[in-house]
Amino acid sequence: MCIPRKYSSQVVDGFERAPSRAMLYPIGFKKDDFSKPQVGIASTWSMVTPCNMHINKLADKAEKGINNAGGKGVIFNTITISDGISMGSEGMKYSLVSREVIADSIETVVGCQGFDGVVAIGGCDKNMPGCIIGLARLNRPSIFVYGGTIQPGKNRTDVVSVFEAVGRFSNHEIDEIELENIEKTAVTGAGSCGGMYTANTMASAIEALGMSLPNSSAQNAISDDKNNDCIQAGEAILTLLNKDIKPRDIMTMKAFENAITVIIALGGSTNAVLHLIAMANAAEVNLKIDDFTRIGKKVPVIADLKPSGKYMMSELVEIGGTLPLMKMLLDAGLLHGDCMTVTGKTLAKNLKNVQSYADSQEIIRALDNPIKKDSHLRILRGNLAINGAVAKITGKEGSSFKGTAKCFSHEEGALKAILNDQIKAGNVIVIRYEGPVGGPGMREMLAPTSAVMGKGLGGKIALITDGRFSGGTHGFVVGHITPEAFKGGVLAVVEDGDEIIIDAQNNVLELLVDQAIIDKRLSKWTQPKPNYTKGVLAKFAKLAKSASEGAVTD
């Protein structure tokens, strides 16, 4: 069987390509490998984070699958950063930037080397959208493999438990020994953060999108299932090459609607809004933030998963993973079953023989007994967010909040105020100049929101920002406010003591100040100087579009 070699043939075929072949012999090529399709394996392996510390071994498994199926696998690395380590620091400004670097680097290596297809393997949060953006741009047969979830720490803790313990320590609820004990036992080994945080959210979205093999999103990082997933992905890429099925054949508008539906049902992260829009942009699909509202009206939240719920991703793995949930949604008419996937089959065919969850499990509810009858991801508008903002409201916080503003021009100031007991019940914490351009980089506010929870203020205060939130954040929070403060959005002129209302029922975010006063404040406002004028952050600030457009750079 002759497998298409559209790109590698241009690199290695013919007498004039002898120098290229000469360079490939030392890396393990044999003469007969030059007649095989070359598949790049984009590995995000790194020792900077436990999310990715095992991915080199998974890349080896994918290479084995490719080679066994008649291709030639070639492993290369792209970067990862650690959100969990950089959170609350200046370094977090590089997090969203890393999404673009990952996409750019995959596009660069694959385009340069002439790979016919790609298997990309990711672990930490930005790996998932970064890989998919790169694959969509290239539009060569491709599969994404998720690195898998971490096991829970002692007493079912994880890294978010440590962030919240900081607030408890500040509140004198635990002592230094207890804090250190949590610190040492919460993160147990390899794998992505264990709740329905951003990594697991995006992995689930990508599987629903059709770009991963079935249940790739719901496997433990260190497991036979994950090893087999990688081998099978390597084999499946040869099927995609034979059938010439490319990412843009899979990543259609209907497929993105499936992804949105699944992440709503799972109670997923607000980051999904930003990243799915960016992924759609790369695939030339016109996905908008209002599509989340449209779909969210008919899709309930049915997964009792952290951070708002009780259970960990590893516990969802134990009861069957995401496939039975997707089958429930398909049978209810909430998914498009005719969408193509990387199996070479439609979503409906992939799910045909999936067994239902056991009646005894308590993690996934029935559709007629939801945790919330519609989406927890709310797109808010009003004079504070003319172009939209994103809230994650599970219902446990209530559906509206009215309070007085306490304003900060950066995350660090807000965190210090929370830990020093300067935030009181009824306050709306306003953190601004943290947007894609103003930060730059749109940092995640896990440190302050976790401190709020640790201080016992959850449900008593709200927090709004033009920055982002970690998937580990819970509480009454609104992010992605556009226009951002640095661009002259109304957020820039909110003053301490101003009343703000957040109405998630009617999707409203409003500053309760007369328009004439707002206009007067805006007329006196001047744009701050950029925080960076050289380097990658400066480049990102110049190129990045608004959060409502996915903060894309192309």
Swiss-Prot record:
Binds 1 [2Fe-2S] cluster per subunit. This cluster acts as a Lewis acid cofactor. The modification N6-carboxylysine is found at K126. Belongs to the IlvD/Edd family. [2Fe-2S] cluster binds at C51, C124, C193. This is Dihydroxy-acid dehydratase. Its cofactor is [2Fe-2S] cluster; Mg(2+). Its EC number is 4.2.1.9. PROSITE patterns: ILVD_EDD_1, ILVD_EDD_2. It catalyses: (2R)-2,3-dihydroxy-3-methylbutanoate = 3-methyl-2-oxobutanoate + H2O; (2R,3R)-2,3-dihydroxy-3-methylpentanoate = (S)-3-methyl-2-oxopentanoate + H2O. The keyword Magnesium applies. Gene3D superfamilies: IlvD/EDD C-terminal domain-like. GO terms for molecular function: 2 iron, 2 sulfur cluster binding; dihydroxy-acid dehydratase activity; magnesium ion binding. InterPro entries: DHAD_IlvD/Edd, Dihydro-acid_dehy_C, DihydroxyA_deHydtase, DiOHA_6PGluconate_deHydtase_CS, ILV_EDD_C, ILV_EDD_N, IlvD/EDD_N. The gene is ilvD. Keywords: 2Fe-2S, Amino-acid biosynthesis, Branched-chain amino acid biosynthesis, Iron, Iron-sulfur, Lyase, Magnesium, Metal-binding. Pathway: Amino-acid biosynthesis; L-isoleucine biosynthesis; L-isoleucine from 2-oxobutanoate: step 3/4; Amino-acid biosynthesis; L-valine biosynthesis; L-valine from pyruvate: step 3/4.
